[in-house]
Amino acid sequence: MSCVNKKISIFIISLICLLITSQAKAALVDDLKDGQHVLLMRHADAPGYGDPAGYDIGLCSTQRNLGDYGKKQAKAIGSWLRGQGINKAQIFSSPWCRCSDTAQLLDLGSVKIETPLGSFFDDMSLEKKQTKELEQLIKSELDKQSKLPIILLTHHVNIRAFMGKNVSQGDMVLVKVNKNGEYISHVIYPSPKP
């Protein structure tokens, strides 16, 4: 193959990759504006497991919180989302500080605390009730037809209960729902590295 043919081949391959990336980027933004999708997100990296005994949901100092890496990770996720064309969003968060801090660090809009996004790790008997409340929250927000993407910051147990899959800290899940806010399908977007 001549040098010119190699350069043409490289150019064509690069152009195809650029087009595919642009389409994927447009697809995420378009999906989040179609009234059938939300972005579920697990909080960024918070070292440890669960919360310390006797924690108080109203006192961040008593909870498991974001570490330095988690704070950088949350900012990187916000940058990645802006790179996908999401510059402003409706953001809802669990009352746990590791979620609300992640939500704030995304820097995509104000954050509203919603109890259905709170962890039920300490009381698994709440799984069905909170999952139903999450579906109602999603339905209610999508019914408003604001066209702003909806981002829901929550925990491992909540995401697993809603869609049946485990995700890592900082991972995002594009979830398609029916008119009642119930899960249909999903695509996982791994957290970008800071």
Q: Language-model segments: what does each one mean?
A:
Residues 1-5:
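N-terminal secretory signal peptides that target proteins for export/translocation
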Residues 10-19:
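Bacterial N-terminal signal peptides
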Residues 21-23:
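N-terminal signal peptide c-region/cleavage motif recognized by signal peptidases
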Residues 26-116, 120-124, 129, 165-194:
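Active-site-proximal alpha-helix that buttresses catalytic centers in soluble enzyme cores
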Residues 36-38, 146-154:
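Generic beta-sheet signal
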Residues 84-86, 141-148:
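Glycine-rich phosphate-binding loop signature in dinucleotide/nucleotide-binding domains
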Residues 93-96, 153-157:
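Short, well-ordered beta-to-alpha junction loops that form the rim of enzyme active sites
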Residues 133-143:
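A short, acidic, amphipathic alpha-helical segment used as a generic capping/interface helix at domain edges
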